[in-house]
A protein has these predicted regions:
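Conserved small/polar residues in nucleotide/adenosyl-binding loops
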Residues: 6-14, 273-280
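Pre-Walker A adenine-sensing motif
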Residues: 16-28
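Hydrophobic anchor at the beta1->P-loop junction of P-loop NTPases
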Residues: 37
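Conserved lysine of the Walker
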Residues: 45
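Hydrophobic positions on the alpha1 helix immediately C-terminal to the Walker A/P-loop
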Residues: 48
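Conserved catalytic/switch belt of AAA+ P-loop NTPases
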Residues: 98-114
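Short regulatory helix/loop adjacent to the ATP-binding pocket of P-loop NTPases
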Residues: 122-135
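Interdomain hinge/linker elements that couple catalytic modules in large macromolecular machines
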Residues: 150-276
Length: 283
């Protein structure tokens, strides 16, 4: 038997939406000296950490003065921000990773640092160079359907009768699928008072200001035009030349900008080899 829940029921839930990855993160924090949580801006990284790890102090590298102190006076920075410490947007001052390495190497404690950031590839590279073997890495994406509808069942699929019977206890009929697809999966959009068009307008402005200005030399209007062109091609085969023609820049520039969208968690390219593998399995 299934239970039908509409989005009205979703909006009435408590402001914080329980994330399925939480038990994994708690386990990793308890067994690792340092944990890194990556994911695009506003998927809920900071909210999750602040809600689930309340004993951690917090430093946010979106703040310029905080970054400056971490870079120029790391000893004073750690004196002002003792462990356990959560450092948000750590990729903005990656030099601190060397200081973190020194601290964790001098201690046997677990759960000393939680780091988060929205530039996945830069962080992975920095971790492999500075904190290899000392950090556990997890990725947070947007809300899943189970998270949106408050389904507590959170086990990976196993083709057994026992799994099916347990899963049937919480079967939910998802209403308004197309509305959810159109709206997206950012947690803030599931606040009943949030206008999604205004939200995405602000999101793009923040993304251009905080991330793109640091990664690419392009004016905001041209890059916004590029974002629009890419969004219109969601689910299609990627044609760099076609996008370059629409935006009015070179094909190499488009390739570079696509890689930036991937690095910041905005797009997820699927390689043609994956598509071919799926076709082979289907055959």
């Amino acid at each position: 038997r299934s239970v039908s829940r509409g989005l009205g029921d979703v909006y009435k839930r408590q402001p914080y939406i329980q994330r399925a990855i939480t038990p994994i993160l708690k386990q990793r924090v308890s067994t690792s000296k340092c944990m890194l949580l990556v994911g695009a801006r506003q998927v809920g990284k900071s909210t999750l950490i602040k809600h689930e790890f309340k004993d951690f102090n917090r430093a946010n590298f979106d703040d310029r003065l905080t970054r400056m102190q971490a870079k120029e006076e790391p000893k004073l920075f750690f004196l002002n921000n003792p462990q356990p410490l959560f450092i948000d947007e750590v990729q903005k001052e990656s030099s601190i990773l060397e200081d973190i390495k020194q601290i964790v190497d001098e201690s046997d404690e677990r759960g000393m640092f939680i780091l988060s950031g929205s530039q996945k590839l830069e962080l992975m590279k920095g971790m492999s160079e500075s904190l290899a073997g000392r950090v556990s890495i997890s990725e947070l994406t947007g809300l899943s359907m189970r998270e949106i509808y408050g389904v507590k069942f959170n086990r990976h699929f196993i083709p057994t009768d026992a799994y099916i019977k347990e899963r049937e206890k919480e079967i939910v009929k998802y209403d308004n699928i197309w509305e959810i697809i159109h709206k997206g999966s950012y947690p803030e959009l599931y606040d009943i008072d949030r206008d999604w068009q205004e939200y995405y307008s602000s999101y793009v402005a923040t993304y251009l200001e905080r991330d793109i200005n640091e990664l690419v030399a392009a004016d905001g209007i041209t890059f916004t035009k590029f974002l629009t062109a890419v969004a219109a091609r969601t689910g299609e085969l990627l044609n760099y030349s076609n996008i370059a023609g629409d935006v009015g820049v070179s094909e190499p520039t488009i390739k570079n900008w696509i890689s930036i969208l991937e690095r910041t968690g905005i797009v997820y390219p699927v390689s043609y080899t994956h598509l071919r593998a799926h076709e082979t399995l289907s055959d």
